[in-house]
Design a protein with these regions (language model features):
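Conserved S-adenosyl-L-methionine
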Residues: 2-110, 118-120, 129, 136, ...
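Rossmann-like S-adenosyl-L-methionine
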Residues: 125-126, 134, 138-141, 145-148
C-alpha cells in the first residue's frame, strides 16, 4: 500500500491512546506503524504514565500476516519502530485471518487494512465458522472479519476494489448485513 495512502487513512481515522488497533492483512505493518507515529505526533509517548505506556506498547497494535517472509519483514519493521511489546498475543502474528486463527484477533476500536485482491489461494473457501456468508472472494471475507471484530462504535478504513460495491448474490447479502450492523 502506498505510504501516502496509509498516512491519509490514518489521519482521517485519528487513532488515540487507549484504543486497540488492528490490521488483519498486515503485510509489513505499515498501517500499524503509521498509526503509532500519528499517536506520538499528538502526544509524546514518554509523557504517558507508566500504565498507559505499557498499554500502548503491549496492548494497542495487533496484526496478522499469512505470507511467512512478509511476516518476518513486518515483525522486523515493528521492532525497528519500537513496537516490540512483551505481550505474545499482540504485535504481528503469523497466520491466516480467514482461518480459525483469525478469530483470535481482538475486538478493536480501529481497523486499518488493505486486504489482498482476488480469490483465496487455491480457490478454497475461508475456514472461519463465524462468517455468515461463505465466499472465495477475499475482500468480502475480510469485510466480514472487519465488521465482526469492531467494538461497538469502532471505526474502519479499508482499501477495497470497486467490484466489492457491485458484486451480486453473496456480495449484496454481505453489504446488506453490514448496513444493518
Amino acid at each position: 500500500t502506498p505510504r501516502v495512502l496509509i498516512d491519509v487513512m490514518v489521519r482521517l481515522m485519528q487513532p488515540k491512546y487507549g484504543e486497540v488497533i488492528q490490521d488483519p492483512a498486515a503485510g509489513t505493518a505499515g498501517f500499524l506503524i503509521s498509526a503509532s507515529h500519528y499517536m506520538q505526533e499528538q502526544k509524546d509517548v514518554f509523557e504517558l504514565n507508566e500504565l498507559d505506556y505499557e498499554r500502548f506498547k503491549n496492548s494497542t497494535f495487533y496484526g496478522m500476516e499469512h505470507v511467512q517472509d512478509t511476516h518476518r519483514l513486518g515483525v522486523m519493521n515493528m521492532i525497528l519502530h519500537g513496537l516490540d511489546g512483551e505481550n505474545d498475543s499482540a504485535g504481528l502474528i503469523y497466520g491466516d485471518t480467514l482461518s480459525p486463527k483469525g478469530q483470535t484477533l481482538p475486538q478493536s476500536d480501529l481497523i486499518l487494512t488493505n486486504p489482498p485482491f482476488g480469490s483465496k489461494k487455491g480457490g478454497g473457501l475461508p475456514t472461519r465458522d463465524d462468517f455468515t456468508y461463505a465466499t472465495s472472494n477475499k475482500q468480502l471475507a475480510f469485510l466480514q472479519h472487519i465488521y465482526r471484530h469492531l467494538k461497538p462504535g469502532g471505526r474502519a478504513a479499508v482499501v477495497l476494489p470497486d467490484n466489492v460495491l457491485f458484486e451480486g448474490n453473496i456480495g449484496r447479502s454481505i453489504r446488506q448485513d453490514l448496513m444493518h450492523k
